[in-house]
Structure formats: C-alpha cells, structure tokens
Design a protein with these regions (language model features):
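Conserved catalytic motifs of ABC-family nucleotide-binding domains
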Residues: 16-35, 70, 137
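C-terminal portion of ABC ATPase nucleotide-binding domains
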Residues: 45, 53-58, 103, 118-124, ...
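ABC ATPase nucleotide-binding domain helical subdomain, centered on the C-loop/LSGGQ "ABC signature"
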Residues: 7, 25-65, 109-117, 124, ...
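Hydrophobic anchor residue at the start of the ABC signature
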Residues: 80, 130
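ABC nucleotide-binding domain signature
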Residues: 4, 10-15, 128
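A short, proline-enriched helix->beta-strand linker immediately N-terminal to the Walker B motif
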Residues: 85-89
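Catalytic Walker B motif of ABC-type/P-loop ATPase nucleotide-binding domains
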Residues: 91-94
Length: 181
C-alpha cells in the first residue's frame, strides 16, 4: 500500500487544525474529489449543516484565513466534517469537540453512533477519540486512561469507574460529584 493510499484511509480532526481562505465547501473537500452530496452529509453528521444553511451563500460562504469569521465551535464542526467527508476507515478526533457546547457534542456523538450502527459490516469506520470530557467517550467500546504519557487504565466506562481511581475522579468532577451513568 502506498503512503498516499494509507493516508486516504484516515480522517483526522484536531482541536486547532487549519481552515484556509476559500469557501466552506472547499474547506471540507480539502482538495479531494468529493461530491457535494457527500459534503452535505458529512456536515450534517458534524452538526455543521444547520449553521452553514443559515448563511446567505451557504456552502459557498467565503472563509477568512484560519476561519476567523467563525466561532470556535463552528470551526471545529467544519474540521470534523472535513475528516468525515472522505468516508475514512479510521477517524481520529483529537480533542476536536472541545469548543462545542454539550448539546452539540451530544448530537455529534449520536450521529456518529447512528452512522456506525448503519454500517455494521466491513465498511464501518473505527473511531479514535482523544478527549478530556468523559461524556464524549463514555459510550466507547474501549477507553484508555493516560497519565503523564502512560496508560493507567483500560476498559469500558463502567469498568473504569470500578477499577481506575483517576478516571472515577475525573468523571465525578465533571458531573458535580456524581458518577456518570
């Protein structure tokens, strides 16, 4: 497999990735041959379609360099849409939803779960989520807890609540003292 083919199998959205001057559609397409309908689907999954559609020129809306004419949450949704648009085999979300409010983050997680359930076959995407919010990862099949670069816990949300004090403390602090259920 060539390096280009390997790279094409990944979709990566990072917390502070780059948006360039150009249209929203071109920023999501990112130089790839992706039809408009697929871009709209990716934007809908990323919870970006609503705000894009509300713009006068929609997907043709011009962005400034680094997307300074968007909010932090809007930028992150476009970056997630970019990662999803290529239908990756492996999706990496590296703190990519940190600027999203809890409602939008929950809607994004729901859309990703529904897409995964619809693809319960060999075409399903493996998703790797790097997150600081327990709510962003609590439904994951496997959670790795890291401390200073070392894995200190591994399991499901329920398993880690029982076996990993660091995970439990984080979950309790984020939920006002109550363990996430």
């Amino acid at each position: 497999m060539s390096p280009a083919e390997l790279r094409s199998r990944f979709g990566i959205a990072m917390q502070n990735d780059f948006l360039y001057a150009g249209t929203i559609e071109d920023n999501i397409r990112f130089g790839r041959d992706i039809p408009h309908e697929q871009i709209v689907h990716a934007a809908a999954m990323a919870q970006a379609h609503g705000f894009i559609s509300a713009l006068d020129d929609g997907y043709d809306h011009k962005l400034t360099v680094k997307g300074t004419n968007l909010s932090g949450g809007q930028k992150q949704r476009l970056l997630i849409a970019r990662a999803l648009a290529g239908n990756p085999d492996i999706l990496v979300l590296d703190d990519a939803s940190s600027a999203l409010d809890y409602k939008t983050d929950a809607a994004l997680r729901k859309a990703l779960r529904e897409e995964a359930e619809a693809q319960k076959d060999a075409t399903a995407t493996t998703t790797v989520i790097v997150a600081q919010r327990v709510s962003s990862i609590k439904h994951a099949d496997l959670i790795l807890v890291m401390d200073q670069g070392a894995v200190i816990g591994c399991g499901t949300h329920d398993e880690l609540n029982e076996t990993c004090s660091v995970y439990r403390e984080i979950a309790e602090s984020q939920m006002g003292g109550a363990i996430l259920e």
